[in-house]
Regions:
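Glycine-rich phosphate-binding loop of ATP-grasp-fold ATP-dependent ligases
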Residues: 20-22, 45-74, 109, 132-133
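Hydrophobic alpha-helical hairpins/lids featuring a short glycine-rich hinge
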Residues: 83-148
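Gly-rich Lys/Arg/Thr-decorated short loops/hinges at beta-loop-alpha junctions or inter-strand turns
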Residues: 11-15, 54-55, 142-145
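Non-catalytic terminal accessory/regulatory regions of metabolic enzymes
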Residues: 29, 38, 68, 76-82, ...
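Catalytic cores of large soluble enzymes that bind and process phosphate-bearing ligands
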Residues: 3-4, 23-26, 61-68, 90, ...
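ATP-grasp fold ATP-binding core
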Residues: 5-8, 12, 39-54, 83-104, ...
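Structural signal for hydrophobic packing residues in well-ordered secondary-structure cores
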Residues: 16, 35-39, 73-84, 117-118
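A conserved helix-loop-beta module that forms one wall/lid of the active-site cleft
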Residues: 1-37, 41-42
Length: 148
């Protein structure tokens, strides 16, 4: 089962894990309404596809005002997002997640994924955040805790 970032954050909120305020959007119009609802000076506009590397591929942008938010929403929604995990064919962005800006004290990476070599699920946690988790895995694997 694959879930999007916004779905994972909904699960976190149900279990009282602090997460930034965010709103999923399935159309450009919904995304613009979400921006207005967040009432935050800074908003992250995030493509929701089942692949990592969204930021490096241009699918995550920070908007510092309404004009920037509108530009990013219109550019990202419907784009064919190509990342190191999608391959050359990429994936069409059909949903966005808008998240209000916050001051980050600490950031963690968590994932439940399939370990194909062991043919079982693995729960992974790291204090190194998730922006370049593949780099962390290859250069400092001891910073990722795995539980099978």
């Amino acid at each position: 089962m694959k879930i999007h970032e916004y779905q994972g954050k909904e699960i976190f909120k149900k279990h009282n894990i602090a997460t930034p305020n965010g709103i999923p959007a399935f159309t450009v119009e919904e995304a613009l309404e979400a921006y207005n609802s967040l009432k935050s000076d800074i908003v992250a506009v995030k493509a929701q596809i089942h692949a990592g590397g969204r930021g490096k591929g241009g699918g995550v942008k920070i908007a510092k005002n309404k004009d920037e938010a509108e530009k990013h929403i219109k550019n990202i929604f419907g784009m064919n997002l190509i990342t190191h995990q999608t391959g050359e064919e990429g994936k069409k962005v059909e949903r966005l997640y808008l998240e209000g800006g916050i001051d980050i004290k600490s950031e963690f990476y968590t994932a439940i994924t399939l370990d194909r070599s062991k043919e079982m699920d693995v729960f992974m946690v790291s204090t190194e955040g998730g922006v370049e988790i593949e780099k962390v895995a290859s250069e400092t694997p001891e910073k990722i805790i795995k539980i099978w």
